[in-house]
C-alpha cells in the first residue's frame, strides 16, 4: 500500500532539516512526500529544493500567495496520490518506525492515531512542557471536546470522500484546524483507532504555530478541579454563550457526515444540548 507524506511549511528553516532527515530515514519508505510552502522568507524553500534534488520522491510546491494553515494543508493533501496519508509538521522529529507501525495498525479503519512526546531545545529550556502519559480514547464524543494532533495521524485517502463538498464554506473551516476536521470525521464514522505508542517527538518552542504556554493549573488534581468549578460558576454567564457558539459549530459540521453509528447520534444530541445558551 502506497503511503504519501504531506508536510506544509512556513518559515521553518531552523528545524526543517531535522524533520526531513527523520522522514527519509523511515524503516518503511514513503511512496512520495508532498512538501508545500506557504510563502516562506527564511530559506525554507531552498532547503526543500535541496532535499527534493537528493530524494526524487519528494515533490515540492510553492503557493503563489500565503494561504494559511487550513488552505495550505487541505490543498497539499489533495495532491497526495497514495492510499494512506501521513501528516508532518515542519519542526518535529519522527520515530524511525512511525510509518511501519502505523500502516500495520490501521487495519480497516479510516484513521490511525499514535502518540507524541514533547521536547524542547537547549535554548528554550525555560519553556514549560507537560506529557500526559494516560491513554486517551478517540471516540466521537471525546473528540468533540478534544482533538488528536495531525502529526500523530495516518489516514486513508478515502476519508476525504466523507467531507462535505463545500467544506471551505462550513463554519468549522474558519473556527478550527484541518486535523480536528479530519479526526472528527473518522471518529463520527467510528473508524478510528489509537495505538499506545510514541511515534513523534513534538518540538515545543514559542515560534511553533500550535504553541501555547502550559498552565500548571490545568494539571488534573482535586485542588485544580475545585478551582475550575469555582471559575465556571463565577463566570458562567460570560463563558456559556461563547461555549454554545463553539459547540454549535461542531454540531453543524457533525450533521454533514453520513454516519449511522449510534455513538454518532448520541454525539449530535450532546452537541445540540451544549449549543443551548441556557442550562
Predicted segment positions?
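Low-complexity, intrinsically disordered short peptide segments enriched in small/polar/basic residues
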Residues: 12, 20, 55, 103, ...
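Nucleotide-sugar donor-binding/catalytic module of glycosyltransferases
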Residues: 1-215
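Generic low-polarity alpha-helical segments
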Residues: 40, 225-228, 279
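Catalytic core of nucleotide-sugar-dependent glycosyltransferases
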Residues: 202-206, 211-264
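Extended hydrophobic/aromatic-rich secondary-structure runs
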Residues: 150-156, 256-261, 279
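C-terminal functional modules
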Residues: 272-279
Amino acid at each position: 500500500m502506497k503511503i504519501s507524506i504531506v508536510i506544509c511549511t512556513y518559515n521553518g528553516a531552523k528545524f526543517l532539516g531535522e524533520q526531513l532527515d527523520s522522514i527519509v530515514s523511515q524503516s518503511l519508505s514513503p511512496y512520495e512526500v508532498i512538501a508545500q510552502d506557504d510563502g516562506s522568507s527564511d530559506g525554507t524553500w531552498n532547503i526543500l529544493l535541496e532535499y527534493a534534488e537528493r530524494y526524487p520522491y519528494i515533490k515540492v510546491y510553492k503557493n503563489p500567495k500565503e494561504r494559511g494553515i487550513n488552505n495550505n494543508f487541505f490543498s497539499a493533501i489533495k495532491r497526495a496520490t497514495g492510499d494512506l496519508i501521513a501528516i508532518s509538521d515542519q519542526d518535529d522529529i519522527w520515530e524511525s518506525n512511525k510509518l511501519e507501525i502505523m500502516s500495520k495498525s490501521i487495519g480497516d479503519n479510516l484513521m490511525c492515531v499514535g502518540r507524541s512526546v514533547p521536547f524542547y531545545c537547549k535554548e528554550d529550556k525555560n519553556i514549560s512542557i507537560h506529557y500526559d502519559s494516560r491513554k486517551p480514547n478517540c471516540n466521537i464524543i471525546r473528540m468533540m471536546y478534544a482533538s488528536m494532533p495531525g502529526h500523530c495521524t495516518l489516514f486513508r485517502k478515502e476519508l476525504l470522500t466523507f467531507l462535505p463538498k463545500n467544506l471551505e464554506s462550513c463554519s468549522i473551516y474558519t473556527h478550527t484546524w484541518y486535523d480536528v476536521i479530519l479526526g472528527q470525521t473518522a471518529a463520527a464514522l467510528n473508524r478510528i483507532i489509537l495505538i499506545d505508542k510514541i511515534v513523534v517527538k513534538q518540538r515545543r518552542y514559542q515560534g511553533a504555530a500550535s504553541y501555547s504556554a502550559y498552565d500548571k493549573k490545568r494539571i488534573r488534581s482535586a485542588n485544580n478541579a475545585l478551582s475550575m468549578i469555582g471559575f465556571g460558576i463565577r463566570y458562567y454567564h460570560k463563558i456559556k454563550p461563547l461555549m454554545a457558539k463553539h459547540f454549535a459549530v461542531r454540531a453543524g459540521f457533525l450533521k454533514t457526515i453520513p454516519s449511522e453509528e449510534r455513538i454518532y447520534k448520541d454525539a449530535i444530541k450532546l452537541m445540540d444540548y451544549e449549543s443551548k445558551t441556557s442550562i
